[in-house]
Amino acid sequence: MKRLDIYPARPFIKWVGGKTQLLDDIKKILPRDLSRRDEMTYIEPFVGGGAVLFWILQEYPNITRAIINDINAELICTYRVIKHDVENLIFELNRLQNEYLPLNEVDRKEYFLVQRERFNERDTSEVETAALFIFLNRTCFNGLYRVNSKGKFNVPHGRYANPKICDEETLRADSAVLQRVEILCGDFAQTGKYAHDNVLFYFDPPYRPLTDTSCLLYTSPSPRDAHES
């Protein structure tokens, strides 16, 4: 059994570079007395899919506060909606799931492209944005997040027989864990002001492209709110 499987809260999306498979190795390099330290704060400047975040907050209940950050505004919007409005998010995801799953392959691709265009128009509510973010992640090719030079999400449709678009149990468990998490969006350096003696930082920055011609952009300039929740 993988270390994260024993807990209900876990990553709500697939994410390139996610650390679910490495949690045992990460635990080995944590301070040996971490579980005995009172009122710890955990800070993750590049949260991504949150595998370490969700695991460590369930493994170490003495970590009473966490601060996460990411420069990807749509990802952070999704974290905030899960924290503050998870039931409306579940409602919207169930709607997308119920519309998508009965379709044949051709119609699924067309439906995917329509939702991708909605997402790229950036004219949706926060709940709709979060739902589209998760829907696209669950139905696109390999769960990639990639945007072009204009900041448009451009990953093609994937071919999955029965993707789990709305995982209600995980979303509710994640929402419960996120109640003790402060959520920031922007440059990772802003987390430095929270450093003090009882803080554990975990750094896992995004990967650089393999070549100069690679177009695997993690984010792009966005008008979305970049202030803390």
State each model region's role.
Residues 218-229:
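Single conserved hydrophobic/aromatic residue that forms the stacking wall/gate
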Residues 147-157, 207-220:
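Mobile active-site "lid"/loop adjacent to the S-adenosyl-L-methionine
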Residues 35-40, 62-63:
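Short helix-terminating capping/connector loops at secondary-structure junctions
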Residues 171-196, 202:
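A mid-sequence, solvent-exposed acidic-amphipathic segment
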Residues 58-179:
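Class I S-adenosyl-L-methionine-dependent methyltransferase module
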Residues 1-35:
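S-adenosyl-L-methionine
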Residues 42-56, 68-72, 134-141, 186-188, ...:
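Conserved proline-anchored active-site loop of SAM-dependent methyltransferases
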Residues 33-37, 194-198:
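Glycine-rich phosphate-binding loop signature in dinucleotide/nucleotide-binding domains
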